[in-house]
From Swiss-Prot:
GO cellular component: cytosol
Motif ('HIGH' region): 58-68
Source taxon at top rank: Bacteria
Enzyme Commission code: 6.1.1.5
Binding site for ATP: 605
Family matches, as InterPro entries: aa-tRNA-synth_I_CS, aa-tRNA-synth_Ia, Anticodon_Ile_BEm, Ile-tRNA-ligase, Ile-tRNA-ligase_type1, Ile-tRNA_ligase, M/V/L/I-tRNA-synth_anticd-bd, Rossmann-like_a/b/a_fold
Cofactor(s) the protein requires to work: Zn(2+)
Catalyzed chemical reaction(s): tRNA(Ile) + L-isoleucine + ATP = L-isoleucyl-tRNA(Ile) + AMP + diphosphate
Protein name (database record): Isoleucine--tRNA ligase
């Protein structure tokens, strides 16, 4: 028997079947670094229209987690897809380097500043620590396959950036947005510092809930208001609170002007409550026998005075819009030094902003004899005992509620009035302008707009000062007596900024005021406060984007971070940019959800359900992690687990196998000389290129919309359905058995070449390592890297006017599917082995029959059978299978006649008819020794 294997065009490629990504990717990274791939891309894109994605800086502390990976991979997908779309899209990664977490780490190792080290030495240690953290995180980000200017990132602790942060504050001061005030701010007693909104987390806490009676100073005036004369016992206004420790700072009782308030007679006294809450309060305090003596509107009680239960003063009733009927008594204990609503209404009524609590959370001397020096959270019991002793406590119980806590210490925080510097939301219209700017930004997903609008509309002034060691100094001088800013503040700040640009923030603390103030130095003091770290990152649109040469003065097109950044970086950036420039710093804002485990639970080390990106990369490779990110809908929570990553790896194998099939069948193909013109190609091959064209349109649209899971779904559908289960199956016969240089084979290779050129580019933003690997095996002259080019423009398709147009092949796909069902049943019944052992007769109604007949003898190649004939639908025998999909089709199957050709495996009756090749069929003889078979359609 002759060996005809050598006459076949068997697929051959060096592209490995197994990805072995964990082993191969580091080598690719080394090549990217050695070649300066990022620099090559920048050179290739020079002069193109720009797209700037400004990196929100992660905090330089600790190893990267799965959330970091999601963020950086999403950014990288966008940057790479924009590059392929013809943009110059530089990516400058950044890090947030100042602030409390770094201070705490350094304190743990070296002690607090001033103990073993001077403040200057402490700052140097902080800088050193941050630098090591940056290096560690940078290695992991690079390992993810993220391309960027990793050699020249921006750090908020770079001297120039620190200087520009000071300049940003100067601009805000110049525009009139800064003011100083003793306002209640979130205060952590462990940090001994004010906290930003974004540094506050909420946890359940058990607190005492108390109802307290404030006796009226003028009992007769109240009787007159309610129109009663006979009241048994004193009259009191009752407040409800869950923070008894704030009662020493009480300066008023807030009531709602339009609520009805009832005077209620109970045993031995009368109490004033919101009428709608009388029943619930009576139940709470355990009173069943009570009488409502009269009612008045809250406005009638304004400025009547009530005695503080244990302090030596009385307080007014005032009117406030913040009073609700959700809980309590309808009368709100008001301490302007301990709450933002209280502060606002206190300003309106000229109340004292009392703050009897020190920075460590203990009462200051002179507050109250039994409270001085006591921690506020331990004081609740003392205050409750005092109220009981004074006869003012109507009820006490425990309640669990959501309470603000420090994000770092996880301990409860307090509102505490301290002298701080604020960016005002309203004194120069910052709130109104910010709300206007929000409307001009595209928010992705679109619910982000309502979220940040609500936050801006309701947020208090931004406290930007901190009492910390490691941070950018505010660089202000205030008058010793008046505490007013120096009249030349902006000029002085620029002088400080110049020094910081040379020597870093230490230049401020080393500065002798006389150096820049001269004789005025005796009248002014340096403000010791540092800036909130959210000011550092929030000003990077100015301190980084405006000054980096690669951005060429263009504002950022996009900010992309987790959904928690509406109140964090998106907010601080919007505030600062609007205060400085009157406009938003971004055109688009994209947010992604948090990562959760496979059961939708938040990731936690204590539960043991965290997924380490380092582990995933070391076991599966970065491309699997990237594919998981891209295939997950980032607009909600992003579930990840070993099982989910295994599914991503399965999808990866499908894509890799498709790419490998293309490459293996391009063996011996030189596009420069072997390409077949579209009009001369086999129709099915043109259809396949048209499928790629349609897929590319969908994929590019999805990339443009940042809809990456749709990119992956469309890519998978193309590989699995259009190619894998139809086209690639059909062409194997022609590809392997036709003459090597025949139009039939070269047409097929031309299609595969066009498809591969498109596919490798679709993959590149997501499966960057694999795309780079595929690129190296593609035939023809090309640039060294796929990332320097643009989307493939060589695709074409069938015209609708052609008889065998896309609709024709769509119907053929359905016919093929119906034939497959019949073959599978025959295999199950042991009537045939493989499909080539079968011959089918298609009984079709006239319109479908005409389409099938048009393919002539090539119909069998589409159906992967050794024989295929078309007959009239009405002639179908009883055992023909009626199609459920195509009503005008019945399929009958029989065993193919003739012998099996050992070369093409088809069963035909002309095997052995040619003496010189007595073992093979006539078609194979033509392909081996003759002119080769001709194919028009398939």
């Amino acid at each position: 028997m002759s060996d005809y294997k050598s006459t076949l065009n068997l697929p051959e490629t060096g592209f490995p079947m197994r990805g072995d990504l964990a082993k191969r990717e580091p080598g690719m990274l080394a090549r990217w670094t050695d070649d300066d791939l990022y620099g090559i891309i920048r050179a290739a894109k020079k002069g193109k229209k720009t797209f700037i994605l400004h990196d929100g800086p992660p905090y330089a502390n600790g190893s990267i987690h799965i959330g970091h990976s999601v963020n950086k991979i999403l950014k990288d997908i966008i940057i790479k897809s924009k590059g392929l779309s013809g943009y110059d899209s530089p990516y400058v990664p950044g890090w947030d380097c100042h602030g409390l977490p770094i201070e705490l780490k350094v304190e743990q190792e070296y002690g607090k500043p001033g103990e073993k080290f001077t403040a200057a030495e402490f700052r140097a240690k902080c800088r050193e620590y941050a630098a090591t953290q940056v290096d560690g995180q940078r290695k992991d980000f690079i390992r993810l396959g993220v391309l960027g200017d990793w050699s020249h990132p921006y750090l908020t602790m770079d001297f120039k950036t620190e200087a520009n942060i000071i300049r940003a504050l100067g601009k805000i001061i110049g525009n009139g947005h800064l003011h100083k005030g003793a306002k209640p701010v979130h205060w952590c007693v462990d940090c001994r510092s004010a906290l930003a909104e974004a540094e506050v987390e909420y946890y359940d806490k058990t607190s005492p809930s108390i109802d307290v009676a404030f006796q009226a100073v003028d009992q007769d005036a109240l009787k007159t208001k309610f129109g009663v004369s006979n009241v048994n016992g004193p009259i009191s206004l009752v407040i409800w609170t869950t923070t008894p420790w704030t009662l020493p700072a009480n300066r008023a009782i807030s009531i709602a002007p339009d609520f009805d308030y009832a005077l209620v007679q109970i045993d031995g006294q009368a109490v004033i409550l919101a009428k709608d809450l009388v029943e619930s309060v009576m139940q709470r305090i355990g009173v069943s026998d009570y009488t409502i003596l009269g009612t008045v509107k809250g406005a009638e009680l304004e400025l009547l005075r009530f005695t503080h239960p244990f302090m030596d003063f009385d307080v007014p009733a005032i009117l406030g819009d913040h009073v609700t009927l959700d809980a309590g008594t309808g009368a709100v204990h008001t301490a302007p030094g301990h709450g933002p609503d209280d502060y606002v209404i206190g300003q309106k009524y000229g109340l004292e902003t009392a703050n009897p609590v020190g920075p460590d959370g203990t009462y200051l001397p002179g507050t109250y004899p039994t409270l001085d020096g006591v921690n506020v959270f331990k004081a609740n019991d003392i205050v409750i005992a005092l109220l009981q002793e004074k006869g003012a406590l109507l009820h006490v119980e425990k309640m669990q509620h959501s309470y603000p806590c420090c994000w770092r210490h996880k301990t409860p925080i307090i509102f505490r009035a301290t002298p701080q510097w604020f960016v005002s939301m309203d004194q120069k219209g910052l709130r109104a302008q910010s709300l206007k700017e929000i409307k001009g930004v595209q928010w992705i997903p679109d619910w982000g707009q309502a979220r940040i609008e609500s936050m801006v509309a309701n947020r208090p002034d931004w406290c930007i000062s901190r009492q910390r060691t490691w941070g950018v100094p505010m660089s202000l001088f205030v008058h010793k007596d008046t505490e007013e800013l120096h009249p030349r503040t902006l000029e002085l700040m620029e002088e400080v900024a110049k020094r910081v640009e040379v020597d870093g923030i230490q230049a401020w603390w080393d500065l002798d005021a006389k150096e820049i103030l001269g004789d005025e130095a005796d009248q002014y003091v340096k403000v010791p406060d540092t800036l909130d770290v959210w000011f550092d990152s929030g000003s990077t649109h100015s301190s980084v984007v405006d000054v980096r040469p690669e951005f060429a003065g263009h504002a950022a097109d996009m900010y992309l971070e987790g959904s928690d950044q509406h109140r964090g970086w998106f907010m601080s950036s919007l505030m600062i940019s609007t205060a400085m420039k009157g406009k938003a710093p971004y055109r688009q804002v994209l947010t992604h959800g948090f990562t959760v485990d496979g059961q939708g639970r938040k990731m936690s080390k204590s539960i043991g359900n965290t997924v380490s990106p380092q582990d995933v990369m070391n076991k599966l490779g970065a491309d699997i992690l990237r594919l998981w990110v891209a295939s997950t809908d980032y607009t909600g929570e992003m579930a990840v687990s070993d099982e989910i990553l295994k599914r991503a790896a399965d999808s990866y194998r499908r894509i890799r196998n498709t790419a490998r099939f293309l490459l293996a069948n391009l063996n011996g193909f030189d596009p420069a000389k072997d390409m077949v013109k579209p009009e001369e190609m086999v129709v099915l091959d043109r259809w396949a290129v048209g499928c790629a064209k349609a897929a590319q349109e969908d994929i590019l649209k999805a990339y443009e919309a940042y809809d990456f899971h749709e990119v992956v779904q469309r890519l998978m559908r193309f590989c699995s359905v259009e190619m894998g289960s139809f086209y690639l199956d059909i062409i194997k016969d022609r590809q392997y058995t036709a003459k090597a240089d025949s139009v039939a084979r070269r047409s097929c290779q031309t299609a595969l070449y066009h498809i591969a050129e498109a596919l490798v580019r679709w993959m590149a933003p997501i499966l960057s390592f694999t795309a780079d690997e595929v690129w190296g095996y593609l035939p023809g002259e090309r640039e060294k890297y796929v990332f320097t080019g643009e989307w493939y423009e060589g695709l074409f398709g069938l015209a609708d006017s052609e008889a065998m147009n896309d609709a024709f092949w769509d119907e053929l796909l359905k016919v093929r599917g119906e034939v497959n069902k019949v073959i599978e049943q025959a295999r199950a019944d042991k009537k045939v082995g493989g499909s080539l052992e079968a011959a089918v007769t298609l009984y079709a109604e006239p319109v479908l029959a005409a389409k099938l007949t048009a393919l002539g003898d090539e119909l069998r190649f589409v159906l992967l059978t050794s024989g295929a004939t078309v007959a009239d639908y009405n002639d179908a025998p009883a055992d023909a299978q009626q199609s459920e999909v195509l009503k005008g089709l019945k399929v009958a199957l029989s065993k193919a006649e003739g012998e099996k050709c050992p070369r093409c495996w088809h069963y035909t009756q002309d095997v052995g008819k040619v003496a010189e090749h007595a073992e093979i069929c006539g078609r194979c003889v033509s392909n081996v020794a003759g002119d080769g078979e001709k194919r028009k359609f398939a």
